[in-house]
């Protein structure tokens, strides 16, 4: 019997940036999928704020993911036929909610994409597309943003830009972020780093440096 996660109990603070690291097969991606309601645990419970998401039916879980969890993926997952503005506002449209203009303006100006709103994904660089994806994740004011290798397809310059944006979302907008990454240079942007191995959390680190993180991953 394979246990992807084994007796894991962990909490994530509001307004905090947490990175999850570990070798392939360590359980980090499974943990993220369960935290985001994309997979269900075979036992145990998961809470997003005060909601036990493991007790929700499919329809309620879908609504919770749409309204209270923002997703940022390695592959951007933008709709190619929509411009940046429409991609950012898509979660609001799907929820039947009117977007808050002041919040929209604050996000696109903070992320430096106000001059790209009429551009489709094919007309933007990878870094610009990921900024749009971050803006889309922020638009619904989610309880938490879950980021799965968000810089995996980016060059080093775009990686620094996107990580700066996620850091600012935490510091300036009070956003909570949980990120899975294999990259120590990316993980040091976080307030806290969890290291997984064999389905367990083996280290829970704060104030990390690249050197201390490299040592913890050995």
Task: Describe every region a protein language model picked out.
Residues 1-190, 195-196, 201:
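ABC family nucleotide-binding domain
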Residues 200-218:
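Conserved beta-strand-loop-alpha-helix hinge in the C-terminal portion
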